[in-house]
Regions:
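N-terminal secretory signal peptides that target proteins for export/translocation
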Residues: 1-2
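Bacterial N-terminal signal peptides
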Residues: 5-15
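Exposed, flexible binding/inhibitory loops of compact, secreted disulfide-stabilized domains
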Residues: 17-154
Length: 154
């Protein structure tokens, strides 16, 4: 009986030691997809405020973008690397937080090593994120080139 009580007490203590999720204060930013073929030809930030704008974007690119998510009070932000001549390029989410009136998002840009064997094909990597529709004046995406980039609230 004493062992069971000690075990339960130890488990309660350990449950308080669980690591925080990587987004921390930026829990309001949700990664929808990280794609290698979005179809956006130039590096940049694209903001879609509703499903109609998202459908217009999907119709204008030769790529694979996810469906509009059913998330209230959220817009979609696409951070794009543009066309790349080979495979092996990518962009991933690191963290997000508020910096005054700015929504600041940190990304990790990856490229193949110079001596890596990669597929010779055009790719267009991007990161699709759901961000809050209000409460910020500017969104800033930070990381290696082509970032940092900013986009004002419309």
């Amino acid at each position: 009986m004493m062992r069971t009580g000690s075990l339960v007490f130890a488990l309660i203590l350990l449950s308080g030691c669980v690591a925080d999720p990587p987004v921390a204060d930026g829990a309001e930013v949700q990664v929808i997809a990280s794609q290698t073929r979005c179809g956006l030809t130039a590096p940049g930030l694209v903001l879609a405020r509703n499903a109609a704008e998202w459908q217009a974007l999907i119709g204008s690119v030769d790529g694979q973008l996810p469906d509009w998510p059913d998330v209230a009070n959220q817009w979609l932000l696409v951070a794009s690397l543009g066309h790349q001549a080979t495979g092996g390029h990518g962009i991933g989410f690191i963290s997000a937080d508020r910096d005054g009136q700015d929504l600041s998002i940190e990304v990790k840009v990856t490229h193949p090593a110079p001596d890596a064997m990669v597929a010779q094909m055009i790719t267009s990597p991007c990161l699709v994120m759901a961000i809050p529709a209000s409460g910020w004046k500017q969104v800033r995406v930070n990381g290696e080139a082509p970032f940092p980039m900013t986009r004002p609230h419309p």
